[in-house]
Amino acid sequence: MPLVREVTFNLLRRLGLTTVVGNPGSTEETFLKDFPADFTYVLALQETNVVAVADGLAQGLKKPVLVNVHTGAGIGNAMGALLTACLNKTPLIVTAGQQTRQMLLSEPFLTNFEPTQLPRPYV
């Protein structure tokens, strides 16, 4: 049976979403391990910059860019840039990492409690 990451990369590849911009933390390590050679990963420091870089790339490439920020705190940091991208009508696909299931039992600091609510209304 294929791994979730393999299925994910195959889907992204089929959709032409091979540019990823992010500020990885430990929760994203498995996503970045053995990162596919036909994908481009753009590393940016701090999530505001991550979304701003992705905004510019998506506009320049004239296609959606995948953005990965680091948990709920990362979404919070990115809100100003998300507002700008929303007003620019830039096609971004935003994901936020989450703590491992075992860690979620103790509600660690970086837990993303309401991941679909936090970035509203801009995502």
Predicted regions and their residues:
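N-terminal alpha/beta PP-like core and its mobile active-site loop of ThDP/TPP-dependent enzymes
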Residues: 1-123
